């Protein structure tokens, strides 16, 4: 019974309240901080749990009054409202009881890279980047371009951005994968639809202490930064390319005029990429069930199609199709695609955890 599962949360919340008032805890800053964080994390569940228990009590109380000649009609009305609220609360509580993804509150690095389709793929990298930018603005997030490689035809061969704000990873973690675009290129005289693809990687921002990199594992090259067509964008050797020898990962940054800043940015992106690899290894070790629960963000999997002639966007993981591609891309309304993905993910987790 759900009520029985909720009581331990209420008990623990009240226990922490008592502990935080004791002199033994108030003199220990670390212990006090840890307890405060734990209390904050369970507070939403406790709040809903108390409301739920009150609803259950009110339902029983109103049932007893149904035959009362004076209060029967009022009890019937209240009972109707309470019976409607009960399942709503149950669903809200189940979502709150889902084990939390430790990365959900992190900022992210979002890497968009042109794949098959040449110029069209690069142009779509630019289009999708701008759509994410609008979605970020709608959520009050901040976006910083970490590195970019322009395409001569417009758009980007590759762009890496840092997205900062509340719940960034929790909302964008399902964007990792292959995004396919179908449209008529501006240069196509016959009006034929071309198909191209880009890949998106979502990497949580990590602290320096979480990923340690041995300097001996790095090969660092500096070079003259260049723009479209190879023209020099500044006259110093400020561009930095870092190769992580054990993994073979290569990160390049030339967006800043300072070599030191470019190296610092490249190292941050490298750490995020290495953290992503560690996450994948951990999921492999925990098995396919865990992989299904958290969503893999596998870059090789085609996750979504953007069909411009039909004004259609389709997410293949949940069989979602919307004929609002123009609004979603131009107004940053990615919530229309992302929210159903989150809801589907939550329902799978509720089932997997027996809630």
From Swiss-Prot:
Pfam families: PCRF, RF-1
Cytoplasm as UniProt keyword: yes
PTM statement from Swiss-Prot or TrEMBL: Methylated by PrmC. Methylation increases the termination efficiency of RF1.
Statement: the UniProt record of this protein carries the keyword Electron transport: no
GO CC list: cytoplasm
InterPro entries linked to this entry: PCRF, Pep_chain_release_fac_I, Pep_chain_release_fac_I_sf, Prokaryotic/Mito_RF, RF-1
Localization in the cell: Cytoplasm
SUPFAM superfamilies listed in its UniProt record: Release factor (SSF75620)
Main location: cytoplasm
Keywords, in A-Z order: Cytoplasm, Methylation, Protein biosynthesis
Record PTM N5-methylglutamine, positions in chain: 231
Molecular function via GO: translation release factor activity, codon specific
Recorded family membership: Belongs to the prokaryotic/mitochondrial release factor family.
Function summary: Peptide chain release factor 1 directs the termination of translation in response to the peptide chain termination codons UAG and UAA.
Classification via NCBIfam families: prfA, PRK00591.1
Name of the featured protein: Peptide chain release factor 1
Gene: prfA
């Amino acid at each position: 019974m759900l009520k029985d599962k909720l009581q331990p949360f209420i008990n623990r919340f009240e226990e922490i309240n008592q502990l935080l008032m004791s002199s033994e805890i108030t003199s220990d800053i670390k212990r006090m901080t840890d307890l405060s964080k734990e209390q904050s994390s369970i507070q939403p569940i406790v709040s809903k749990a108390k409301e739920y228990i009150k609803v259950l009590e009110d339902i029983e109380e109103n049932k007893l009054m149904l035959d009362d000649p004076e209060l029967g009609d009022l009890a019937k009305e209240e009972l109707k409202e309470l019976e409607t609220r009960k399942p709503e609360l149950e669903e809200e509580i189940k979502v709150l009881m889902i084990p939390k993804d430790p990365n959900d509150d992190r900022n992210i690095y979002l890497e968009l890279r042109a794949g098959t389709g040449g110029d069209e793929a690069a142009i779509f990298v630019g289009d999708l980047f701008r759509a994410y930018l609008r979605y970020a603005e709608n959520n009050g997030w901040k976006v910083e371009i970490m590195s970019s490689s322009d395409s001569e035809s417009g758009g980007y061969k590759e762009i890496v951005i840092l997205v900062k704000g509340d719940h960034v990873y929790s909302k964008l973690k399902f964007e990792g994968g292959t995004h396919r675009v179908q449209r008529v290129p501006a240069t196509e005289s016959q009006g034929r639809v071309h198909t191209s693809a880009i890949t998106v990687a979502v990497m949580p921002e990590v602290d320096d202490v979480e990923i340690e990199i041995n300097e001996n594992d790095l090969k660092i090259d500096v070079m003259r930064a260049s723009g479209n067509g190879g023209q020099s964008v500044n006259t110093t050797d400020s561009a930095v390319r870092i190769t992580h020898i054990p993994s073979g990962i290569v990160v390049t940054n030339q967006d800043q005029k300072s070599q030191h800043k470019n190296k610092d940015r490249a190292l941050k992106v490298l750490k995020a990429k290495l953290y992503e690899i560690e996450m994948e290894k951990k999921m492999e070790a925990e098995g396919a069930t865990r992989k299904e629960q958290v969503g893999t963000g596998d870059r090789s999997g085609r996750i979504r199609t953007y069909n411009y002639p039909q004004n259609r966007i389709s997410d293949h993981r949940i069989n979602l199709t919307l004929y609002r591609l123009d609004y979603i891309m131009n107004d940053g309304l990615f919530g229309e695609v992302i929210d159903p993905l989150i809801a589907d993910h939550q329902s799978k987790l509720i089932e997997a955890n027996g809630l």
